[in-house]
């Protein structure tokens, strides 16, 4: 098995951050699993939403780094929900249970789409203060599978896994990306048939984001410019949808940059959250803020962030 699963960082994470399970629906089979780390005094934390293949722990490198810098971070794993409205209603109940009025959301792929749908769903009584959308999309029709969305629940687990694995990089990749793919395959193997079927249904069910409902929310679009499951057209559509978004470009990183390019991803997350420091929506403990340090780090990595 890949290096990530046996790495000291991952083992430290699993040994120190407890996995919590929370039920907020009448149906007690719908269980949210989450890691909640960092200062509980922070009332507007950053919440990570995983892709189809991911579990909450795929963001362990963000949790370790960001909590070390004073941020409160929550990484989630979804219950089995079969449509976007059901997901949004369940997520709202979860935030109520956690007593969080507003949050920042980082969504990867499907997680990014669900983050946008939740912001849209709560636009009259906003719960989302900002969005970071990583390798994400705004319209499920890009996958050309809306016609099969209603039949995923019938398919056996091995077939569903094959569909998901079809989007993983198959060409040559560097060792860190190979390790990330191995880890994600392992995480995929841990998901049951209903979990996978429901996520693929959410990923492909005919739906799109209505931008006018969420146009006032600060957005960072994080894209990778090597092999990823997203087409150039899908990326361009996101830029059009959010013309004022900050753009965080990673030259490489594939589908899972939060695992194999974590230093860059973590830095972009810090840069995004910096705009809220000193407000009641800061995701960081005020005593830990050091903008100068962040600027030095930004310069040393030589990352070019384009704002448009």
Swiss-Prot record:
Pfam family, one: Abhydrolase_1
GO MF annotations, alphabetized: CD4 receptor binding
Key words of the record: Cytoplasm
Compartment list: Cytoplasm
InterPro entries documented for this protein: AB_hydrolase_1, AB_hydrolase_fold, Maspardin
GO cellular component: cytosol; trans-Golgi network transport vesicle
Highest rank taxon of the organism: Eukaryota
All copies of domain AB hydrolase-1, residue ranges: 87-159
Matches recorded under Gene3D superfamilies: alpha/beta hydrolase
Keyword Cytoplasm: yes
Protein role: May play a role as a negative regulatory factor in CD4-dependent T-cell activation.
Family to which the UniProt record says this protein belongs: Belongs to the AB hydrolase superfamily.
Subunit structure: Interacts with CD4. Interacts with ALDH16A1.
Name of the protein described by the UniProt record: Maspardin
Source organism (scientific name): Macaca fascicularis (Crab-eating macaque)
Gene behind the chain: SPG21
């Amino acid at each position: 098995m890949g290096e990530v699963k046996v790495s000291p960082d991952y083992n430290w994470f699993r040994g120190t951050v407890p996995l919590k399970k929370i039920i907020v629906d009448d149906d007690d089979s719908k269980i949210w699993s989450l890691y909640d780390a960092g200062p509980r005094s922070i009332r507007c934390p950053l919440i990570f939403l995983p892709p189809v293949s991911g579990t909450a722990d795929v963001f362990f490198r963000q949790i370790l780094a960001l909590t070390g810098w004073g941020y409160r971070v929550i990484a989630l794993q979804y219950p089995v929900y079969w449509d976007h409205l059901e997901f949004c209603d369940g997520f709202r109940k979860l935030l109520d249970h956690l007593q969080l009025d507003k949050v920042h959301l980082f969504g990867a792929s499907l997680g990014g789409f669900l983050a946008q749908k939740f912001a849209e769903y709560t636009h009259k009584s906003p719960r989302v203060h900002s969005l970071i959308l990583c390798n994400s999309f705004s319209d499920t029709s890009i996958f050309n599978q809306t016609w099969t969305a209603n039949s995923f629940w019938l398919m056996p687990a091995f077939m569903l896994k094959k569909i998901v694995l079809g989007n993983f990089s198959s060409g040559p990749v560097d060792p860190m990306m190979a390790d990330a793919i191995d880890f994600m395959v392992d995480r995929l193997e841990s998901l049951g048939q209903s979990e996978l079927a429901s996520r693929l249904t959410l990923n492909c069910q005919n739906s799109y984001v209505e931008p006018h409902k969420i146009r006032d929310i600060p957005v960072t679009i994080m894209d990778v410019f090597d092999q990823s499951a997203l087409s150039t057209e899908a990326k361009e559509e996101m830029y059009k949808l959010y013309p004022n978004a900050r753009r965080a470009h990673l030259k490489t990183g594939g589908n899972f940059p939060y695992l194999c390019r974590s230093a860059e991803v973590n830095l972009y997350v810090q840069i995004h959250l910096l705009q809220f420091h000193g407000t009641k929506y800061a995701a960081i403990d005020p005593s830990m803020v050091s903008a100068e340090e962040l600027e030095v780090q930004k310069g040393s990595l030589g990352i070019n962030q384009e704002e448009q």
